[in-house]
């Protein structure tokens, strides 16, 4: 059954986008708890569906296979659900169909982090991020800047530099509630 997508703004899925390692999953879980909504990490759901990790999928089936699975899952989620907090993988928003579906049916929040602060997280990120493997720091910065441009289409940008996940989640919840109050009158 397809949901009528002319739903009130407060019932839309909240989609978190941003570069890998910015904290989409951690912050998304906190926001979901505070708003009493279900949390969906797209990468984790794809891993469950195919019974393999994203790095294994890249290695065994290729990036194209993963990107197709990602697109199918996200577009369906946007078109057929509501009241979810959704964390997209860092590269998902590169796909136009995903971007269109998210912007049409959901509220999209860009979690932004400076290159300098992201670089400090690199040691804990690199192992499980196949797209970073075999890249120099300059190539990673180029990817970071390229993706940042892709994330420029969003409903709201949330600066995360020097903030704890809890602080970011509280800011998001407060901002959403204010917006919902304004749009429901």
Swiss-Prot record:
The entry marks the following residues as binding substrate, namely 43, 67, 90, 147
InterPro entries listed in its UniProt record: P-loop_NTPase, Shikimate/glucono_kinase, Shikimate_kinase/TSH1, Shikimate_kinase_CS
What compartments host this protein? Cytoplasm
- Cofactor(s) listed in the protein's UniProt record: Mg(2+)
Which reactions fall under this protein's catalytic activity? Answer: shikimate + ATP = 3-phosphoshikimate + ADP + H(+)
What does the UniProt cofactor note say?
Binds 1 Mg(2+) ion per subunit.
Its pathway is: Metabolic intermediate biosynthesis; chorismate biosynthesis; chorismate from D-erythrose 4-phosphate and phosphoenolpyruvate: step 5/7
Q: Which residues bind ATP?
A: 21-26, 129
Question: Whom does it interact with, and what assembly results?
Answer: Monomer.
What job does this protein perform? Answer: Catalyzes the specific phosphorylation of the 3-hydroxyl group of shikimic acid using ATP as a cosubstrate.
Name of the protein described by the UniProt record: Shikimate kinase
